[in-house]
Amino acid sequence: MPALICGSLAFDTITTFPGRFAEQILPEQVHILNVSFLVPTLRREFGGCAGNIAYTLKQLGGEPLVMAAVGADGQDYLARFEAWGASTEFVRTVTDTYTAQAIIITDTDNNQITAFHPGAMQSAHLTAVPSGRQDIAIGIVAPDGRDAMLQHAAQFAKAGVPFVFDPGQGLPMFNGDELNAFVQQATWVAVNDYEGRMLCERTGKSLEALSNSHLKGVIVTLGAEGCEVWQKGQRTHVPGVKAAEVVDPTGCGDAFRGALLYGLERGWELTRCVELGNRIGALKIACRGGQNHVIDRAALAL
């Protein structure tokens, strides 16, 4: 059955500066900052949390249903979904703006300067989670426009669809009351360790307390160290999986969440879902971009 993935679709333009930002940006001159970086390499990737999650879920054999917005330049993304055999019925095209864009410059110290244009993402809230669909088994509220995240969470709850609250980099947009409302509406919460600390600070609740509630689990990713799973106040550590090589961490969290949705939709135990997520995250980090890793289902015994 389909998993409804609410989140962003974006194009990532990634460049490399063959020097150090520290040698180009003088601390005593930042008040008159005017710099230009020659970037001899450039690549464009399909990105955005919803797109990345959907890619992994589809590779695993799941059925992603993306709810997001693209701009007038979004035809390539729509064609990509159609090539997968994925439905675009909930992807809105906003003709008077661009698809969300991230423009990233990385230096030789792996420092990054990023400019982000939200574009069509600001209209994502105009598409609503359907209330009468019996075929949608599970959902996720991933980073998106602020209004979209608030409304889609409430709509999932009203429709009775279990969903993962995955605030990601969108977490700082919300205050404690709003985050508590998200948690009350959600079935699971997924964060990284930094986001987990911020969530606890803003809600005034520990991970133990958050999990000792109606939630079926709180998942905290720890990078190479694996993952913590909190259920009814009890913590379980699921070890990480060593990557063949570390090439690009972009989209690792999204790959993990695609695997998480795959397992949850099939009724797996949460720790088993997380184990698969750790394996897929290790696979993804060895590839550039968020949608280029290839998953061998037979090797995963799926």
Where are these regions (language model features)?
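Glycine-rich phosphate/adenosyl-contacting loop at the front of the ribokinase-like
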Residues: 1-65, 76, 246
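Ribokinase/PfkB-type carbohydrate-kinase core domain
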Residues: 1-20, 42-45, 65, 79-237, ...
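Short, conserved aromatic-histidine micro-motifs
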Residues: 30-37, 75-76, 139, 275-288
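Gly/Ala-rich phosphate-binding loop of Rossmann-like dinucleotide-binding domains
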Residues: 58, 157, 265
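Alpha-helical transmembrane segments within multi-pass membrane transporters and channels
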Residues: 66-71
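Conserved phosphate-binding/catalytic region of the ribokinase-like
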Residues: 204-302
